[in-house]
Amino acid sequence: MEAGYAEIAAVQFNIAGDNDHKRQGVMEVTISNLFEGTLPAEGGIYDARMGTTDHHYKCITCSHQRKQCMGHPGILQMHAPVLQPLFIAEIRRWLRVICLNCGAPIVDLKRYEHLIRPKRLAEAASSQTEGKQCYVCKVIHPKIIKDSEDYFTFWVDQQGKIDKLYPQIIREIFSRVTYDTVVKLGRSKNSHPEKLVLKAIQIPPISIRPGIRLGIGSGPQSFHDINNVIQYIVRKNLLIPKDLQIVRGQKIPLNVDRNLQTIQQLYYNFLLDSVSTTATQGGTGKRGIVMGARPAPSIMRRLPRKEGRIRKSLLGSQVWSISRSTICGNSDLHLDEVGYPISFARTLQVAETVQHYNINRLMPYFLNGKRQYPGCSRVYKQITQSVHDIEGLKQDFRLEVGDILYRDVVTGDVAFFNRQPSLERSSIGVHRIVVLENPKISTFQMNVSACAWYNADFDGDQMNLWVPWSVMSRVEAELLCSVRNWFISTKSSGPVNGQVQDSTVGSFLLTRTNTPMGKNVMNKLHAMGLFQTTQTDPPCFANYSPTDLLDGKLVVSMLLKQTPINYQRAPTWYSEVYAPYMHYNKQDISTQIRNGELIEGVLDKKAVGAGSSGGIYHLISRRYGPQQALKMIFATQQLALNYVRNAGFTVSTADMLLTPEAHQEVQEIINELLLESEEINNRLLHGDIMPPIGLTTHDFYEKLQLNALKFPDRILKPIMNSINPETNGLFQMVATGAKGSNPNMIHIMAGIGQIEINTQRIQPQFSFGRTLVYYPRFALEAQAYGFICNSYIAGLTSPEFIFGEMNGRFDLINKALSTSSTGYANRKAIFGLQSCIVDYYRRVSIDTRLVQQLYGEDGLDARQLETVRFETIMLSDQELEDKFKYTGIQSPLFEEEFSRLKKDRDKYRQIFLNIENFNFSQLLTDVRQVPVNVASIVKNILLSSTSGVLPFDEKSILQKYTMVKTFCKNLPYVFINNIQERLQTPIPVYLKRAASLMRILIRIELATVKTLNITCEQMSAILDLIRLQYTQSLINYGEAVGILAAQSVSEPLTQYMLDSHHRSVAGGTNKSGIVRPQEIFSAKPVEAEQSSEMLLRLKNPEVETNKTYAQEIANSIELITFERLILQWHLLYETYSSTKKNVMYPDFASDVEWMTDFLENHPLLQPPEDIANWCIRLELNKTTMILKSISLESIVNSLRAKHPNTYIMHSVENTASGIPIIIRIYLRESAFRRSTNTRMATDEKIAVNLVDKLLNSTIRGIPGIKNANVVKLMRHRVDAQGKLVRLDNIYAIKTNGTNIFGAMLDDNIDPYTIVSSSIGDTMELYGIEAARQKIISEIRTVMGDKGPNHRHLLMYADLMTRTGQVTSLEKAGLNAREPSNVLLRMALSSPVQVLTDAAIDSAVNPIYGIAAPTLMGSVPRIGTMYSDIIMDEKYITENYKSVDSMIDML
């Protein structure tokens, strides 16, 4: 009978008690000795029954040697019980809730039935149990006291009598607790509290605490330090009397008490970390021991941190052998090749099994041995199952079928290539090895265009390379990890590779129409020479004579015709910025390729550059596959580099020099900037700078200076006038996108301008009021604050050089500080999302719990998308009718078609206009990413047709329309199967929505007016191609989309954090660049957010176009507290006299006059009789009141309404210039009365508290709105003619702070268009679906143009909101989403705490996802391992054919 095969479905965690230890133990430790002579001592802590790590003796239990023996635990019977150190808090909870006399619960268990199981005991223990009477035995429950000096000691205070609770007493108490009580308090029967006090502890196997002995007998030996701890425990245990009986309240001998305390501490050190040798550590009562100069090791210390067992061995990947070296570039290598030094190739070995078909190939390796390359190092003999060194073989040794030969690495082997950090899956790619025969080479070499996969460069980067050993692993590596699979980025849906730097410039120079010497032409021999290194089929030059001149476009077309495509786009070379200063050839301002022929234009970054979405290589990959695209990149690169080598290209200092006239013009521009800066300085000195609300004068001054010192766009004019764009190498590199930018060119040639650190000018931190030693204190000139007038080519002065270095130093420190935070954020994201896997229905689920009904809401793989334009979206009703309505045949079908097109347009507009209204910066556009470019398919079909333009008839037109209509109707069946399509079963709504965008595009591109010249056969071929590409674009089953989303978001987020410079309190470098991303992913509540904003549209259309009215509304909603309107205030202790009308303080004697006027003008506001002796005198800020349109009357009325226990007097509002507005607030005696009605009129604390309340009083505005400013918006609207109109004169209010509910109550605000950046505020008011959308929009807003495909953002949002609440990506969020996945949470962080909690709760962990199966030693069900393979072994055996029989058949 054959043995069955099963997988572990789940793991349960429990607390191990005495019985568990005894059942698992193979022997009992009785002595502390290690060895007796040459063998382990029987009954000692190195007993051979617990395993072996020595080759001199076998394990007695399993009879295996040290390599095969896994080890077996033993037990130590304790003479007195010990507390389980991991569960001290649990022991304390049980002692608080059960009777110490009878073990019955002393709390009402029914009160906690509504709580979830894990929270019941903790909630019961937090209640007041001291002094309660037991329901059963009527004994009063004492107070449980934790010893502050000893972590493991508990005391009971019984009516003043304090007794010590020894572990033996606690064990007796717990033994009386019933299982029914345990279950009702939320614990499992396996977690009975009696297990928390141990009489038998487990001794770990020898295999996890190995020893080393050199020789036999008295030779040198070294043992694991944990053995010393076990020895201490055994020795202390022997000092305790065997039959020790402890009765509660009875005193025991002092030496026994100390031994009990010591053995408890030793057991703690044995299990958990020991951190100190002091008697107590930090007041926690935890003592520690050391071994030599380091803390004693512990069992649990092996689990956490990067070097722990979980991350290092169980989750971390390991290989037999690996090589590492510095990388350098080699353009002679293909993108999927890697140059490997021969010294490495002779060291790294590849195991290959000898077979009939390869024995002749392997024989040279065998004969060469170690003497000559390629050779081998050793042979595994199958018959004897032994390994032989190749140099020690006998003459009669023969290589036979079945042997394994460990040969050298040779050209053609596949290898993994990796650069750390591995933030994306493309960071590990499989390349073909090319062995470099030159022995002086010791670096890895790779094509420059291949660096994009690894984010590598050649400034000293090092990479790893290792070769898979088995045939299976080599095949899997080539199929699953080949770099061709990473050509299209999962993150951006665009191509990763392309031409860079030299080859980009070469492509431009080769394809431009004219050169400085005339037309860009070459002879036949030169053109043929360009193809020498392309490693493609050489084009035919037979039709050209040696005297014929070929232009660059023709030469490139010969290459492109091998993979014919159609392409049209404006090149990077043409720019509106340069157009006024240079002459463009009309044939170079638009690049057009038709059926593989370059008709016009040039090839630069937009066409052939790395990462160019929609470029030439992207189109080739979509039509011919990524492998063909990589070949074309290499061929184009070789063509461009060969041309550059022949034609020449360089950047010299002559390219960077300005003419005297241009230099003079640049100096004039710089002088204008300096004069404007000086004018701002004069305004500051004369006090003419008036900052807006929310900014100090200094901050506003710095902002004015930064704006004034920016180089204007016209500084490009003298640069462009002094160079020749046709010959200037620096300009050509910038203009073609090969390297550099306009600011780089300005810095090199004209001037560097203002240096900014943390978005600020250089601050005076050298000393008080001084930036550098070169400038005097309080200098105001722009040069003293980091403005550099000189350019790099002109040279920098000493202070200018230092300013530049300060900026570089800031970037270095900022990167160093951010690396740890971004790395941990990436790791949290990986663990938080790794359980999200696509199932057979293309749903995303965590085990059986649904996350997305359909991945990305459309089921598409982000790598299978391309950008297309929807023609109808921007058209008006009349334009749509003129362009798309077919009137050649009178039929209701075409009315239906046009009506459908119009509905599609309106539906598209409605969806994306809603998105535009509820996002800060996402405008509607007619460009979208779809899986099929229908227009391209139609064009390719027409170009490949040889029949020309055919006449069309009414029948074929109707038939084509019917074909398209039926196809669009059945398109959602692509998500299901052909059987359901034939049966026409109902389609779920979410599948119809998933295909809606694609159906809109198909109806546009295959409208009747656009397909008149297409035959029915061609239409059928077009529809078949659309269906094929659409099916191939669907996400694969078993795809780990959670990890893909985490990688795609974390990598650009890391770059965002490094680029974000925020100001810290000290004005230096800090980590606040990660504040906003942390707020989003940590799901922080509203009150904890630091950067929340709101965008408020105005309800009245007339008002939202008037900036003045909009500012008035912004002022009215901005929260104005009384404190913001005050210049200074004083708390005075004085006696108010209504008759004398005088004041006590001489400094304020002038107040008498206006106080007298106030009483005369306000006869109804006379002072009350109970005025206390406390007065608050305040001076108001008139400027702030004017800017915020707040009157004195509104301030006083608001204060009187909110503080009735005061008497308020004030001066007049229209005071003369320089005379402040004064308010005096007298406190009444009722404000000082307490519950005892005792007068406290002299209580200063109460007066100060009242002052705080007054200052924080709200005068006007919405709570939470710290600041409100008017901003200009750009939005779209549909006019009466159905045309989409862009409005750029709309004003809205942008606030600092959020309060959606408060804003909705304002009559001037449109409640339907309120946008808040706060996820918490959105969740509270609109619900979980709105919060989901807000997470998506906020991540996109944070990342901007560098953001990933929206499918990855959907993955984040759906996971964070799956439970109905917004959960974070932190440990707490993972606990809420996957509470049962203990192994995953343990792998993320705090494994000891997670395991402890799981054991207390008796958690059952189903094995799913990635981390849990990996930790259990099985293969996760993802990717190709998601589906099971069923194999008929009987059929294979019956139909097996030997090599001889196959040869005979041949």
Swiss-Prot record:
Inducers of expression: Expressed in the late phase of the viral replicative cycle.
Catalytic activity: RNA(n) + a ribonucleoside 5'-triphosphate = RNA(n+1) + diphosphate
Primary site of residence: virion
Enzyme Commission numbers on file: 2.7.7.6
Cellular compartments annotated: Virion
Record-linked InterPro entries: DNA-dir_RpoC_beta_prime, RNA_pol_asu, RNA_pol_N, RNA_pol_Rpb1_1, RNA_pol_Rpb1_3, RNA_pol_Rpb1_3_sf, RNA_pol_Rpb1_4, RNA_pol_Rpb1_5
Alphabetical list of Pfam families matching this protein: RNA_pol_Rpb1_1, RNA_pol_Rpb1_2, RNA_pol_Rpb1_3, RNA_pol_Rpb1_4, RNA_pol_Rpb1_5, RNA_pol_Rpb1_7
Gene3D superfamilies: 1.10.132.30, 2.40.40.20, 3.30.1360.140, 6.10.250.2940, RNA polymerase ii (3.30.1490.180), RNA polymerase II, clamp domain (4.10.860.120), RNA polymerase Rpb1, domain 3 (1.10.274.100)
Keyword Transferase belongs to the record: yes
A single MF term (Gene Ontology): DNA binding
Top EC class, one word: transferase
Swiss-Prot/TrEMBL keywords: DNA-directed RNA polymerase, Nucleotidyltransferase, Transcription, Transferase, Viral transcription, Virion
Entry's Gene Ontology cellular component terms: DNA-directed RNA polymerase complex; virion component
One GO-annotated biological process of the protein: viral transcription
Comment on protein domains: Lacks the typical C-terminal domain (CTD).
Functional summary from the UniProt entry: Catalytic component of the DNA-directed RNA polymerase (RNAP) that catalyzes the transcription in the cytoplasm of viral DNA into RNA using the four ribonucleoside triphosphates as substrates. Forms the polymerase active center together with RPB2. Part of the core element with the central large cleft, the clamp element that moves to open and close the cleft and the jaws that are thought to grab the incoming DNA template.
Family the entry assigns: Belongs to the RNA polymerase beta' chain family.
Subunit structure: Part of the viral DNA-directed RNA polymerase that consists of 8 polII-like subunits (RPB1, RPB2, RPB3, RPB5, RPB6, RPB7, RPB9, RPB10), a capping enzyme and a termination factor.
Protein name, per record: DNA-directed RNA polymerase RPB1 homolog
Source taxonomy: Viruses, Varidnaviria, Bamfordvirae, Nucleocytoviricota, Pokkesviricetes
